[in-house]
Structures are given as structure tokens and as C-alpha cells.
Amino acid sequence: MLDMNMFREHADVIRADHTKRGLPHDNIEKVIELDQAWRNLLHETDQLRRAKNEAARGIGAAKKAGDNEAAQAILNQVADLGQKIADMEAKTNEAMTVRDRLRMSIPNILHKDVPVGADESGNTAYAVHGTKPEFSFEPRTHNELIEMNKWVDLKRAAKITGSRFYFLKGDLARLEFALQQYAVDFLRQRDYTFVQPPVMMNREAYEGVTDLGDFETVMYGIEPDKYYMIATSEHPLTAMYMDETIPEEQMPMRMVGVSQCFRREVGSHGQSDLGIWRVHQFTKIEQIIIAKPEDSWALHEELLQNCTDLWDSLGIHYEVVNICTGDMGTVSYTHLRAHETKANLVCRLLLE
């Protein structure tokens, strides 16, 4: 979330970033307006406190002069001012909550190298690794492979959960575990601490790591406890140190997390691909670094290097894409820059 001083002192920078993203400026102006209203309320509250303190000083003088009636009048005035202060503090806190809730929806300022584009067609190639494999036979699709080997049971999963869930079985289930272990060990060798996070988070923690206004639509909520099933391991790993001040000498803090994740995936996927690509429950491995802002760009490159080195170690052909402004998405407003690695999935039955 952008610091409030950015809105007060560098609003033009935020407006220019919105223009780059193709977003209207309305919410920026609203945040500035709400901030001014909050500051006005804060000023009024401070004035009431000063008036209360000044009045309270007269109580002793009135009692010393033996004027009990005047002392009581001042006491009543102080009590009345105390109630006004309490009411004003409630209004001030509410104004700050409304301002900050809207401020959370304002994207971070993009890195200068992020390409400008309306959608994914504006993404640019960053790097290509390896060569596309060629075969002397016609490769089978993922659908064919899982059916002939009975590695996935979709029908029985649908009986107990609905669509886009599956039972993973046999060697394919073992392969998934093996890949998780391989990736974790790969990063542990680079001094990343292995963490298994909770798969539920409360609302307060979630609001600290993403804009729930947009992301909440793809999440599973648990009533009446106000918990959410996590949509990515990144969220609990980032929230782990909420309300804490991390000593500078402890940074950067490198972590690798593995967890089950849950999303209400929507769209046309599910017919030709048997519903195994856009699913509601899946495993994610995330690498997270908590660091000082001035070190963040170098560490972004470290994260990208880890990712490409992992793909290289598996001998898989892939490309790295520099995500453009229009493809960042509203749930990616925390991103200042983003890269995606896209592997060559030989056996996938493509929908295009």
C-alpha cells in the first residue's frame, strides 16, 4: 500500500502511473479528499483536547477560592468536552478506516521497465531457454495419459466435491510429491528457510497482503469465523510477520513455502482439458524474500534467477515473459514488476 505522503506530496506520480495502467484517476482524488477530511477531524479533536485541558486547570483555582458552584460548572464542562472528544475520535478513526480501505486499492508505482500494453498481447519476451523438443512419434495429450494410466479420478471427486477437483493417484501423485521435495531442496541449498504455512487466514491478516475488494471473489470464505482458505502460499508467508518490526540485520529473510491453495476458478476451462488445469485446490511452492526497499530490485532478479535455474535443471524448454501494465490484473496491484515463466507443455491439449 502506498504511503499516505505519496498522495500528499507526489500525487502526480500516482496519476501518471494510473495513466500507464489505463486506470481512471477517480480513486486517487477520493483518497486525497478523504485524507483532508481526516486531517480536519484530527485538528478539531486536538482543539477539543486543548480546550478540555485548559478548562481542567480552572477546577483547582475555583476550589481554592471556595467557589464550589464554579468548580462544578467546570467539571460539567470538562465532562461534556470529554464526550465530544470521544465522539470525534470515533469519527476520526472511521474516516481513517474509509480512507485506508480505498488507499489499499491503489496500485504500487510500476518499475520503469514494465512494458505498456492493454492486455497480454502487450507482454514482451524477456528470455527463451532451451529448444523446443521434437519427437519421432505423435505425443499423447495429458488427458489421454491420465486416462490410460488411471492416474486421476475426476468422477469420484465430483461426487464428493463438485467439478474441478480430482483424486491424484499412483505414480502421478508420487511425482507431484517428488517435484515439491525437489523444488524445496533446490531453494534450501540457496539458504531459503522451508516453511509450511497455515491454509487459513483471518480477514485482518488478508487485508494486509492484498486488496480483498477484488481478490475476495475468487476466494473461499469460512463463516461465521471470518476466515479465508488461502489462495496462494505467498499470502500467509508475507503475513507471518504482521505487526512486527524486523531488525535490519536480520534482512533479507528468505523463505520457501509449500501449501495447498484454494480458488473459485471461473471461465471456459473444463471441457476440452477435463477440468484439470483450472482447479479449485492445488499445491503451490512460493519463494518469498522480506528485505529493505533499496535491495528489492536486486532480490527480484535473484528470485527470477532461482526460477529459471530450477527449470533449467529439469531440462524443460520455456520462455520468460515481461508482463505489461494491462496484464498485471487488479489482484496484482502490489506488483511493481512481474515476470512469468511459461513452459512448453508438449502433451497438453491446447484449447486455442
Tell what function each PLM region has:
Residues 111-129, 136-268:
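Active-site loop/lid in soluble adenylation, ligation, and acyl-transfer enzymes
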Residues 296-333:
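Extended C-terminal subregions enriched in glycine
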